[in-house]
């Protein structure tokens, strides 16, 4: 019989609550122990209580005092970048070897996008899940990168305003910075750029991501096959992840190069990928694919780490 590792979630907002429901319903190697918030009236804490999960509204300071904390092996932090630095320090002061999965853009640990680099980090003590936009788009950059050298990649993540809680809104600058860096570090681009758009349309629109990749000249069939293979790999843990339309290519000749401000002229192959992410509607409705891809990636990561601990 599989030993389930107990987990706590810090942050009882949209992301934390969605993740809790996924763990309770779908986890094979993890067991929900504590939901941590700072607002005693939050819907996430109320829902956790109704689902039989222990709660505290006193933040991480409250968590480390709880008897349940003694058995917790994993903590998911779904707060904000600024709060995560303090949370991680307090958790380690109490339990030095604890595994922390960071769902904020703080990035004090290595970046992780499961389909690209999870196996390199199964023993990490703090792992950063980049951002929702990063989880959706970096696999596409990496897919091109394994076929041809990528000089520049730019992503535009469009999410429904209703899916963005106060934590997401407070972290816009951190979102763009962390995603841009991870496009380079994990995606393999020499230079990365990220843009996020919160769309106030009613009814809310599903998460859409556009990925532009400028690479050396390459066989377009090979690039497309690599992208389709990567989409299938992401879809294994995010069932609503899909190509919205066929991959588009444009050959940029040496005689008419593109000028990228700040980066100079470019010729080669431009690949455009259009992604749609439909949420599983565990907490917010299906338009909130940005929640789903983040929590699904975090769950897949922790499940693999827990499995590795059991095999050790």
UniProtKB/Swiss-Prot annotation:
EC number of the protein: 1.2.1.10
CDD domains the record matches: ALDH_C (cd23933)
Catalytic reaction equation(s): acetaldehyde + NAD(+) + CoA = acetyl-CoA + NADH + H(+)
One of the protein's GO biological processes: catabolic process
Residue sites binding NAD(+) per the record: 12-15, 163-171, 290
Pfam family for this entry, one: Semialdhyde_dh
Molecular function terms from GO: acetaldehyde dehydrogenase (acetylating) activity; NAD binding
Keyword NAD: yes
Keyword set, alphabetical order: Aromatic hydrocarbons catabolism, NAD, Oxidoreductase, Plasmid
Keyword Nucleotide-binding: no
Domain of life, per lineage: Bacteria
SUPFAM superfamilies listed in its UniProt record: Glyceraldehyde-3-phosphate dehydrogenase-like, C-terminal domain, NAD(P)-binding Rossmann-fold domains
Active site, per annotation: 132
NCBIfam families: ac_ald_DH_ac (TIGR03215), PRK08300.1 (NF006157)
Family: Belongs to the acetaldehyde dehydrogenase family.
Protein name: Acetaldehyde dehydrogenase
Organism name: Pseudomonas putida
Organism phylogeny: Bacteria, Pseudomonadati, Pseudomonadota, Gammaproteobacteria, Pseudomonadales
Name of the coding gene: cbzQ
């Amino acid at each position: 019989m599989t030993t389930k590792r107990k987990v706590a979630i810090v942050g009882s907002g949209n992301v934390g609550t969605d993740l809790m429901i996924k763990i309770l319903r779908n986890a094979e190697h993890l067991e929900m122990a504590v939901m941590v918030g700072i607002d005693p009236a939050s819907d996430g804490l109320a829902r956790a209580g109704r689902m039989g999960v222990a709660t505290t509204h006193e933040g991480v300071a409250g968590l480390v005092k709880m008897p349940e904390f003694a058995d917790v092996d994993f903590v998911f932090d779904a707060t904000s970048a600024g709060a995560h630095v303090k949370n991680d320090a307090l958790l380690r002061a109490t339990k030095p070897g604890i595994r922390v999965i960071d769902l904020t853009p703080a990035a004090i640990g290595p970046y992780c996008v499961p389909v690209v680099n999870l196996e390199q980090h199964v023993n990490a003590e703090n792992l950063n899940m980049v951002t929702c936009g990063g989880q959706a788009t970096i696999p596409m950059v990496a897919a091109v990168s394994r076929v041809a050298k990528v000089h520049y990649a730019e992503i535009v993540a469009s999410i429904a305003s209703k899916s963005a809680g106060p934590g997401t809104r407070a972290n816009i600058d951190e979102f763009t910075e962390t995603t841009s860096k991870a496009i380079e570090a994990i995606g393999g681009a020499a230079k990365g750029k990220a843009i996020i758009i919160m769309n106030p349309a009613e009814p809310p629109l599903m998460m859409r991501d556009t990925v532009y990749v400028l690479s050396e000249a390459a066989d377009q069939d090979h690039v497309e096959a690599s992208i389709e293979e990567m989409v299938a790999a992401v879809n294994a843990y995010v069932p609503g992840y899909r190509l919205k339309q066929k991959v588009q290519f444009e050959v940029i000749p040496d005689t008419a190069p593109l000028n990228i401000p700040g980066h100079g002229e470019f010729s080669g192959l431009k690949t455009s990928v259009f992604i749609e992410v439909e949420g599983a509607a565990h907490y917010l409705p299906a338009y909130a694919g940005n929640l789903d891809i983040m929590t699904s990636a975090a769950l897949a990561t922790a499940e693999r780490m827990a499995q590795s601990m059991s095999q050790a």
